[in-house]
Amino acid sequence: MNDSAHIDYARYDHIRPLLWTGDALELLDQRKLPFEVAHVRCDSSDAVAEAIHSLAVRGAPAIGIAAGWGVVLAARDIAADDGSAALQKLEPALLRLNAARPTAVNLAWALMRMRRVLGAAGADWREVIAREAQAIADEDLAANRHMGALGAALIAPGSGVLTHCNTGSLATAGFGTALGVIRAGMAQQRIAKVFAGETRPWLQGARLTVWELQQDGIDATLIADSAASHLMKSGLVQWVIVGADRICANGDTANKIGTYQLAIAARHHGVKFMVVAPSSTVDMATASGDQIEIEQRDPGELFGVGGVRTVADGIHAWNPVFDVTPGDLIDAIVTERGVIAQPDLARMQAAFGA
């Protein structure tokens, strides 16, 4: 039942947020969804960095993929006889890309892959980095489809699920992480009902997740973030399924702000909590969530909705955009390498090494 062959990908996997045209990176502008489908054309690495920072492209896997193509674009501006020489000249562009969003480990991971292959490349270094950027995207899509099947297998038929933020095709190379599990669960008739939190302040759940599910013909119910505990108490959901921007060696998980409170509420109400992310999101070099840098964005993002100010002048705001869920509140971490139940340091080391 958990075989991915049971999934109609023509129906459940047709949205693509990134397209490499051969001379530019085209990004589906997620700031304008769902009412306008527009694209941002990036002709330089700086344009890619700005698109990442401004949330034109978002989602940990997607920004890693975008950064890979950003390196390819940066390479056009330099001359070098081999990869090692090119790497020295490209380092400023790599640093600018890495600084675009600090919390998601996939960004640094993708850039490290590009550094590694570049340093070992010869005269064909331009072709080498283009192949590596494409490989990062291809591997992410394959991982997402596999994780979808693994995660769906944990869900009893007839279950209701709640998700947070956007973890679908828009956040990845395709299919999605947590939303990939939901897509697979719907395709296999394991999931009976899907709820999505609106996800203030950027409303990724309201603007993106329910739109994605609508494109697939999946009926989803939007809730206010503050309604989640009441929903769990009602008995309508058996799983909370979320993505991740960084998973630490002990299982602590950084994800969109609001995830931590969902995990606390889920544990109180006996609702299971699943984190779905590719192994590139796992950071075994970070011992615990206390060591994660949490991105703080402009407080002005909290002052209004849809460009309309709703807050009086002179009000202060605090706007962290990620929080850390302790590993002991997580029932399962699903990666393409398998399922880690009740994650802790020993189980994480067994799956990913020290």
Swiss-Prot record:
The UniProt keyword set, sorted, is:
Amino-acid biosynthesis, Isomerase, Methionine biosynthesis
Give the record's pathway: Amino-acid biosynthesis; L-methionine biosynthesis via salvage pathway; L-methionine from S-methyl-5-thio-alpha-D-ribose 1-phosphate: step 1/6
Q: Which residues bind substrate?
A: R58, G59, A60, R101, Q204, N255, K256
Q: Spell out the Pfam families in the cross-references.
A: IF-2B
Q: Where is this site: Transition state stabilizer?
A: C165
What is catalyzed by this enzyme?
5-(methylsulfanyl)-alpha-D-ribose 1-phosphate = 5-(methylsulfanyl)-D-ribulose 1-phosphate
Q: Which N-terminal stretch is annotated as signal sequence?
A: none
Q: What is its EC number?
A: 5.3.1.23
Supply the enzyme class, top level.
isomerase
Per UniProt, what is one GO molecular function of this protein? S-methyl-5-thioribose-1-phosphate isomerase activity
Catalytic residue positions: D245 (proton donor)
Any single GO BP term: L-methionine salvage from methylthioadenosine
Protein family according to the UniProt entry: Belongs to the eIF-2B alpha/beta/delta subunits family. MtnA subfamily.
The entry's function note states: Catalyzes the interconversion of methylthioribose-1-phosphate (MTR-1-P) into methylthioribulose-1-phosphate (MTRu-1-P).
Query: Could you identify this protein by its name?
Result: Methylthioribose-1-phosphate isomerase
Species of origin reads: Xanthomonas euvesicatoria pv. vesicatoria (strain 85-10)
